[in-house]
Amino acid sequence: MRKVLCGLQAVIFCILLWTGCSVKENRRECPCRLFLDFSETDAEDVPYADLHVLSGEGFHLVEHVDSVAFGEELVLHVPRRGARVNAYCGAEGYVSEDGSLEIPYGSECPRVYMHFSYVETDCEAAFEKVRVRKNYCLITVHVEETDFPYVLDVRGEICGYGVDGSPANGAFLFAMRPDGNGVCSVSVPRQVDNSLRLDVDDGTDVLKTFALGEYVTASGYDWSAESLGDITIGLDYSLSHVTLKIEGWEKELHFDVEI
């Protein structure tokens, strides 16, 4: 009788052990509940967010979130192998299938607000704050001569943002023609060096080049700031003097340029 009981106990133990392993394996296959908190995104600047959640093996979830829902947590079910959370506002037509943002050569940067983060999701529930911030700098150029006959070309070496939010290397060009008041503007992406420049082009040749990136760096402007500010540039009639003013700053910087 004792041998029968011992045998029965062994069978029951094996069944429990097999069941436990099975439950554990099933839980691993279950998705992670990802809670996204938009409460630190300013609805006045960001009326909506186009959410791209990417994980391995081709998982790409796209969700449109209106600002009225920013006060509530958004719950998504994602694979348990980590997820990249990208959110955009103002980037329609520029976001690729892999979640990166590409600026076509000849176009300016879209007036985009963005969030990028990577979340570990090897768990039953994960939490992430989504902070959508301004990721473009609007450079407005004032030319002293209102009847300015030339085109102003802004060139750089950043052409968008990678899937991880880092500035993407590539040629950038946007051509501007000042209006009747001598004003024009361009939106540029976040920079990583001083390569940004401003060319004065008469249609056949570059007459003058301004080291725009160096002027901006000398001003103390922070390209790594969470939200990028805007810049105003002034060019005198002879194109030999540059003024630079950063949005929200009282001081104005002056640079003399050799002809």
Please give the residue ranges for each predicted region:
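Sec-dependent bacterial lipoprotein signal peptides
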Residues: 1-24
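Extracytoplasmic cysteine-anchoring/structural motifs
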Residues: 20-259
